[in-house]
A protein has these predicted regions:
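Terminal substrate-recognition subdomain of acyl/acetyltransferases
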Residues: 2, 8, 158-171
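Conserved active-site tyrosine of GNAT-family acetyltransferases
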Residues: 140, 145
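Conserved GNAT acetyl-CoA-binding A-motif
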Residues: 110, 117-129
Length: 171
């Protein structure tokens, strides 16, 4: 069936781009800062400023990934994957700008990062999120992530740790 045509119809182009090199590296850095401001948490305990200054850092291929989601060429969101010990990867800095939410971009970015993790041979992927981030938690649960005990020390209240296997586990 052909896509609808007519007045008011606009085809939206969504692209996931590798942001491990300029010029998208600066876009990713800006999105990371926006993410940090939006969650309203000081991430100094994670070495956030050092992370920004050294991008792509741990998110560089082949062990990591740094993606920017573009909608009609406009930066709409981001996400990253980095290696942890023991054949485990970690999703970080998952963020979709409010104006672009509800289009499945977060899922698209997360799926691409999970695919990269599987291709890299990671046995599992972990993440941490905050209790108030209900939409993010629901997304992760729908993708097969389950709550686990803390895998690192985080001084923030209400941190939820999650993990998902990379093999062919049910989502």
């Amino acid at each position: 069936m052909a896509p609808p045509r007519g007045e008011g119809y606009h085809r939206v182009v969504i692209e996931l781009a590798d942001a491990s090199a300029p010029p998208l590296l600066d876009v990713a850095r800006d999105l990371f800062r926006e993410y940090q401001l939006a969650i309203g948490v000081d991430l100094c305990f994670q070495g956030f400023e050092r992370e920004l200054a050294s991008l792509p850092g741990a998110y560089a291929p082949p062990a990591g990934r740094l993606l920017v989601a573009l909608v009609d060429g406009a930066p709409a969101g981001c996400g990253a994957l980095r290696p942890l010990a023991g054949g485990v990867g970690e999703l970080k800095r998952m963020w979709v700008r409010p104006a672009f939410r509800g289009r499945g971009l977060g899922r698209l970015v997360a799926e691409a990062l999970l695919q990269a993790a599987g291709g890299q041979g990671y046995r599992a992927v972990r993440l941490d999120t905050l209790e108030p981030m209900k939409e993010a938690r629901a997304l992760y649960a729908s993708m097969g992530f389950r709550e686990i005990p803390p895998y690192y020390e985080n001084p923030l209240p209400g941190v939820i740790y999650m993990e998902r296997t990379c093999s062919g586990a049910a989502r």
